[in-house]
Amino acid sequence: MGVCGYLFLPWKCLVVVSLRLLFLVPTGVPVRSGDATFPKAMDNVTVRQGESATLRCTIDNRVTRVAWLNRSTILYAGNDKWCLDPRVVLLSNTQTQYSIEIQNVDVYDEGPYTCSVQTDNHPKTSRVHLIVQVSPKIVEISSDISINEGNNISLTCIATGRPEPTVTWRHISPKAVGFVSEDEYLEIQGITREQSGDYECSASNDVAAPVVRRVKVTVNYPPYISEAKGTGVPVGQKGTLQCEASAVPSAEFQWYKDDKRLIEGKKGVKVENRPFLSKLIFFNVSEHDYGNYTCVASNKLGHTNASIMLFGPGAVSEVSNGTSRRAGCVWLLPLLVLHLLLKF
């Protein structure tokens, strides 16, 4: 309902009918603009929702009566207001100009407005079209989503506005990779862990600043041990074995030696777990502690393991792809003693 959708005062009903006859603007009859040098209304008027629209009509001293109409309903006739909408006010009524203002414009105000005048000869009309622009607004967007690696996802971002806004999707974290879609819908087939992170939906139509919303996409995948560190430690010293694993959800770690799980606090051993890292700490290394240890990382999607060596001084540990193995030992002191015995 536009500015014309308000009731008229009952005592003016007869005058309304008279004015319609006077100005010859019956409902449904098209009105042409520019049939004469006057009245001359503005070209199309474009305003943003919430702003004020001024409708001006240029006239001259030959005019005896003048009115502004919204479609076929009179808003103002001369100085008299026929519309009860408080947003419609008279700005000027002079020999050269007849203007009204519609305040706090809304989308239902959009449409044709007619300036109608009466001269000594016959009525004349001129029309202007009011265009209402609306800032973009995102009315529907997908919720944050958690999905297993390899599955397909579809993200939705619905926006309204006048003109119709352009919607774009962009992957912004963990690192920006530019625009990935210029559509309301973003389809990702066989999603990978690298495609996790925040996705930004932007709606713009040049009426106001773009509107931005974000969706967080979490990609779940089984653990992958990216680093497994063995170490050489003398007897009686502190030693640490490290196992680092990438996983979503975060991996849970367990340590084993000779197929037996190591329990924290037993035999001077401590297990220190963080979301992506586990440490097996020996406070006082003994000969019995040397050997091969297994780090197991697991989450709800799977598990993996790596072999890590704790060795003594002089031993060489070869580490590859999260596993370590003993390559050999060279004990320098026994060789030196043997050399001295043979010499003498």
Curated annotation (Swiss-Prot):
A biological-process GO annotation: cell adhesion
Membrane topology: Lipid-anchor; GPI-anchor
Taxonomic superkingdom: Eukaryota
Gene3D superfamilies, per database record: Immunoglobulins
Subcellular location: Cell membrane
Annotated lipid attachment (GPI-anchor amidated asparagine): N321
UniProt GO cellular component terms: extracellular region; plasma membrane; side of membrane
Annotated disulfide bonds: C57-C115, C157-C201, C243-C295
Carbohydrate-modified residues: N44, N70, N152, N284, N292, N305, N321
Main location: membrane
Pfam families noted in UniProt: I-set, ig, Ig_3
Keywords of the record: Cell adhesion, Cell membrane, Disulfide bond, Glycoprotein, GPI-anchor, Immunoglobulin domain, Lipoprotein, Membrane, Repeat, Signal
SUPFAM superfamilies: Immunoglobulin
Recorded family membership: Belongs to the immunoglobulin superfamily. IgLON family.
Function: Neural cell adhesion molecule.
Name of this protein: Neurotrimin
Organism field: Homo sapiens (Human)
